[in-house]
């Protein structure tokens, strides 16, 4: 199974970073995970999202 996680912006609070890392460690045992981080500018990245969804 392949999972793509598309994120807008970055996590800024330590609690969220720790929670994400823990969850990621659990998931990567069962699936191939790709994390794509985009800028917070939604309009500027819309074409990139469409391109990623076409895969």
Curated annotation (Swiss-Prot):
GO terms in the biological process aspect are: rRNA processing
GO molecular-function annotation terms?
Answer: methyltransferase activity
Q: Where is the signal peptide?
A: none
Question: Highest taxon of the source?
Answer: Bacteria
What protein name applies here?
Uncharacterized protein in ffh 3'region
| Taxonomy of the source species | Bacteria, Bacillati, Mycoplasmatota, Mollicutes, Mycoplasmataceae
